[in-house]
């Protein structure tokens, strides 16, 4: 019996709505939260032990739900 190829439509990560993604790039997070890219980078630099971001090589990825919890408890950013 020959193996048959099954065509599966792959969803690209960019096709997933921002509010459903696990991580966001700095640019995506800036647009979504209306916080400047510089301010987001400063938050990451001043909070190196927080768990609302992770590094993928030299790229910063914001963990959306954890960052929202961080913002819920913040009085100022």
Where are these regions (language model features)?
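Short, Lys/Arg-enriched anionic-surface-contact patches
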Residues: 1-14
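Residue-level detector of intrinsically disordered/flexible regions characterized by low predicted structural confidence
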Residues: 6-9, 41, 65
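Polyanion-binding surface elements
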Residues: 11-39
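A short, Lys/Arg-enriched interface patch at domain edges and termini
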Residues: 4, 66-77
